[in-house]
């Protein structure tokens, strides 16, 4: 990442580190096969394979990177971890690598991503950390960015399979979308089509709590059109928009908008030193 002021800021917030592997190193795979979902549909991801001479070192480096991301480099956890799979996304401009890490003690798995570092993505991740209720851990080294996995149902899958719910849950879905719409606009995060966020569902005493979480921060403050930063204007999101029209009055919509703006303002005040440093980069 060549933007020196941004690199200085990231270093001051402990985002910069020395990685044993770079994004370009993962591009040296020898073969790949399409990764299919449970229904046999193409996921637009490919599982990639490396030569035997390179695989051992790559897997070792990726395991260490996972320890840096999750345990601040505590190498004691490495004894129980191994790399199960490396996937490469062929869709869009980002083209990330998704790394699946297995805990051999219980066969539980987790993921993280290796991406090209750029200023827009770094700004977006930092603003997410400061202004949203969601924290995404990430690390940067030169032109490589490591990003933790955000768990949830992809927005487009959620639209297809999860909207036919109780009226109570449908109202909560519409409410969360209103708040998500505000969060994206206030911090100028664009292109929130349904495949660029996930839906985190938490069972509650009555019904479920819904949280929409961004997974693509590439389009941060990069466009002059207002509507680009409002998820409500992307037709992919129409099914949720229609839920809002069905269940919400204009007064209720304004109430939820004001609630979220107040929460964002509170987060900005509580992190004002860090936010001011970022905005002056």
How would you label these PLM feature ranges?
Residues 165-226:
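Conserved kinase catalytic-core segment
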Residues 204-281:
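C-terminal catalytic region of ATP-dependent kinase domains
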Residues 131, 164, 228-232:
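Short secondary-structure boundary/capping segments
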Residues 18, 22, 40-156:
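Conserved ATP-binding subdomain of kinase catalytic cores across diverse folds
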Residues 1-36:
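Long, charge-dense tracts
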Residues 23-42, 260, 265-272, 279:
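Phosphate/pyrophosphate-binding loops and the adjoining catalytic core of nucleotide-dependent enzymes
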Residues 157-164:
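AlphaC helix of the protein kinase catalytic domain
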């Amino acid at each position: 990442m060549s933007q020196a002021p941004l690199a200085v800021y990231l270093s001051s917030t402990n985002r910069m580190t020395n990685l044993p592997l770079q994004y370009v190193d993962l591009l040296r795979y020898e073969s790949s096969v399409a990764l299919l979902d449970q229904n046999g549909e193409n996921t637009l991801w490919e599982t990639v394979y490396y030569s035997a001479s390179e695989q051992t070192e790559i897997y070792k480096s990726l395991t260490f990177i996972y320890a840096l991301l999750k345990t601040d480099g505590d190498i004691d956890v490495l004894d129980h971890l191994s790399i199960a799979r490396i996937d490469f996304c062929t869709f869009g401009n980002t083209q990330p690598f998704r790394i699946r890490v297995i805990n051999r003690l219980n066969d539980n798995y987790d993921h993280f991503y290796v991406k090209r570092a750029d200023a827009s993505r770094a700004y977006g991740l930092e603003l997410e950390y400061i202004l949203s209720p969601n924290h995404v851990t990430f690390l940067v080294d030169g032109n490589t960015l490591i990003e933790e996995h955000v768990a949830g149902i992809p927005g487009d899958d959620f639209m297809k399979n999860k909207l036919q719910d109780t009226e109570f849950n449908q109202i909560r879905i519409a409410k969360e979308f209103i708040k998500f719409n505000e969060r994206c606009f206030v911090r100028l995060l664009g292109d929130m089509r349904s495949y660029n966020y996930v839906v985190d569902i938490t069972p509650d005493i009555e019904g479920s709590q819904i949280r929409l979480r961004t997974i693509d921060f590439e389009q941060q403050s990069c466009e002059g059109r207002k509507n680009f930063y409002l998820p409500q204007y992307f037709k992919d999101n129409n099914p949720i928009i229609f839920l809002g029209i069905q269940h919400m009055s204009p007064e209720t919509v304004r109430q939820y908008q004001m609630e979220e703006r107040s929460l964002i303002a509170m987060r900005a005040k509580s992190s004002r030193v860090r936010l001011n440093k970022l905005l002056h980069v």
